[in-house]
């Protein structure tokens, strides 16, 4: 990523309202955003281009966020993954960490917390 380029965040959620809100929030804060309505669409795109960070919903109809993160690791090892979920379950957090997920954030999302976690994840990403 060039120093003048906007960091690119890929957001995956099956809820169109969440996608729209996250797109607005992230673009307003200076990120370039691509949204995907399911994990399959992201996997199809991930092989063609890469993100600086992925924000992935845990519960989606085609693939859960942890399995999606595991599959992403095969194509884009260095980009951090942040999992968002409405299910406060320690088992999800443990499984997410084992899959290489950088952080798990509970919905409803606290806007500034999400932005802070994305910036921290991108900053810590290997070059």
Predicted regions mapped to residue ranges:
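Two-component/phosphorelay signaling modules centered on CheY-like receiver
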Residues: 16-34
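The feature encodes the CheY-like receiver
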Residues: 19, 61, 89
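Acidic catalytic/metal-coordinating carboxylates
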Residues: 37-38, 64-67
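Active-site beta3 strand of CheY-like receiver
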Residues: 50-55, 60
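Short amphipathic alpha-helix used as the core "switch/output" element in two-component signaling
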Residues: 66-77
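Alpha4 helix (beta4-alpha4-beta5 surface) of REC/receiver domains from two-component response regulators
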Residues: 67, 88-103
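C-terminal output helix
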Residues: 91, 109-118
